[in-house]
């Protein structure tokens, strides 16, 4: 199993609207083959910071998701939020192997 984390920080626009979009996109991803779960996290002290945590059976399942129309649809829904700006230096995507 692998875990993918994706972290961003909103610098303009409505972070609450982004939180709603994130909640709505979960159904686009968690039903795909190989997806074991999705969590959307919002930092307690810095509410403009978000982290998406996805769990996949293996790297092939994650790669297939990135090529799936659901990947583009989920990211497009976020990009379409009026006035939303994401700090490009805050975007961090990391992969982890699950050891236990």
Predicted regions and their residues:
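Short, flexible segments with low predicted structural confidence
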Residues: 1-2, 17, 33-35
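Glycine-rich beta-strand-turn "strand-cap" elements at beta-sheet edges
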Residues: 2, 39-48, 76-100
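A generic structural signal for ordered secondary structure
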Residues: 10, 29-32, 95
């Amino acid at each position: 199993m692998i875990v993918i984390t994706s972290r961003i920080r909103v610098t303009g626009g409505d972070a609450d609207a982004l939180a709603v979009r994130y909640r709505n996109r979960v159904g686009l991803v968690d039903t795909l083959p190989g997806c074991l779960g999705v969590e959307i996290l919002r930092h307690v002290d810095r509410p403009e910071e978000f982290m998406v945590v996805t769990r996949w059976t293996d790297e092939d399942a994650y790669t297939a998701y990135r090529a799936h129309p659901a990947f583009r649809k989920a990211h497009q829904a976020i990009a379409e939020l009026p006035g939303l700006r994401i700090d490009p230096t805050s975007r961090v995507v990391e992969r982890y192997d699950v050891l236990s």
